[in-house]
A protein has these predicted regions:
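Sec-dependent N-terminal signal peptides of Gram-positive bacterial secreted proteins and lipoproteins
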Residues: 1-17
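N-terminal Sec/ER secretory leader and immediately downstream segment
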Residues: 23-128
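Solvent-exposed, acidic/flexible segments
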Residues: 97, 101, 125, 129, ...
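Amphipathic alpha-helices of TPR/Sel1-like and other helical repeat/solenoid scaffolds
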Residues: 172-185
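Short coil/linker segments at helix-helix boundaries
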Residues: 131-132, 145-173, 205-221
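Short solvent-exposed coil/turn linkers within tandem alpha-helical repeat scaffolds
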Residues: 134-142, 182-194
Length: 221
C-alpha cells in the first residue's frame, strides 16, 4: 500500500509538472520574437557607438536612443495588444494568474523588458527599471548619469495614477526633494527642464492629489 501511495503521489506531481511546462510554453508563444529581437539589436548598436564616444556625444546618443526606443516599444505593444488588453479577462485565453505573470516576465527579462501594470487594468510592455542607467552610466556626463540613476529608482515603483496615489506622502516629498537637489546641483543641465517638470508633478500630487482623487474635496484640475 505504501508503495502504491508513493506511485500515485509521484504520478500526480509528474502530471502537474507537465501541465505547468505546457502552460509556460503557451505563454512564451504569445510573444513575437522578431519585434523583441529588434529591441535587443538596437541596444547592441547603441552600445557599440558609446564605446567610441566622448561624454557629450554619449549624452546626444542617449537622447536619440530614448526617442527611437519609444517607437520600438510602441511597436512591441501594438504587436501584443490583444494579449495585453485581456490579461485581466478571465474569459480570455490570455488571462494571467500571478504565476503566469511571473513566467512571462522571466522570459521578457531576457530582453530587458517586463510587463508592467500601470494600475486600473492598464498593462504595457516596458523596459526594466534600470535599463537606461545600466547602458549609459559609464559614458555620459555627470548630470545625465545622476538623472538616469534617479529615474531608474523611480521606475521601480509606481508613485501615482490618475485614480490614486500609491505611496506615502513622505515618499512624494522625498521625490520632490531629490529633483530640487538635482536642479540646484546642475542648474544649467540640458535635463533641467525635465527635472523641473518632475518637480512640478510632485508638487501638484503632494498638494492636490491625483486627478481623480484630489485632496481638496470636489476640486479637480
Amino acid at each position: 500500500i505504501f508503495t502504491i501511495a508513493i506511485f500515485v503521489i509521484g504520478g500526480i506531481f509528474g502530471y502537474k509538472k507537465i501541465v505547468s511546462d505546457e502552460r509556460e510554453k503557451k505563454i512564451i508563444q504569445m510573444f513575437n520574437k522578431d519585434v523583441l529581437n529588434s529591441f535587443v539589436e538596437n541596444k547592441k548598436s547603441v552600445i557599440e557607438r558609446l564605446k567610441t564616444s566622448n561624454k557629450e556625444e554619449a549624452d546626444k546618443i542617449y537622447n536619440e536612443y530614448l526617442e527611437t526606443n519609444q517607437l520600438i516599444l510602441e511597436n512591441i505593444n501594438t504587436e501584443h495588444l490583444d494579449f495585453l488588453n485581456n490579461i485581466y479577462n478571465k474569459d480570455s485565453k490570455y488571462y494571467f494568474t500571478e504565476k503566469d505573470w511571473k513566467t512571462a516576465n522571466k522570459f521578457l527579462n531576457n530582453y530587458d523588458l517586463e510587463i508592467f501594470d500601470l494600475a486600473e487594468t492598464e498593462v504595457s510592455i516596458i523596459e526594466v527599471p534600470n535599463y537606461y542607467y545600466n547602458i549609459f552610466k559609464d559614458y555620459v556626463t555627470d548630470d545625465y548619469r545622476e538623472y538616469l540613476e534617479i529615474t531608474s529608482k523611480e521606475n521601480e515603483e509606481l508613485y501615482y495614477t490618475d485614480g490614486s496615489i500609491l505611496v506615502s506622502y513622505n515618499k512624494i516629498a522625498d521625490g520632490l526633494l531629490t529633483w530640487e537637489n538635482f536642479l540646484k546641483k546642475y542648474p544649467n543641465s540640458d535635463l533641467a527642464e525635465k527635472a523641473n517638470e518632475e518637480c512640478n508633478t510632485y508638487r501638484r500630487i503632494y498638494i492636490l492629489g491625483s486627478y481623480n482623487s484630489p485632496t481638496r474635496e470636489g476640486e479637480l484640475y
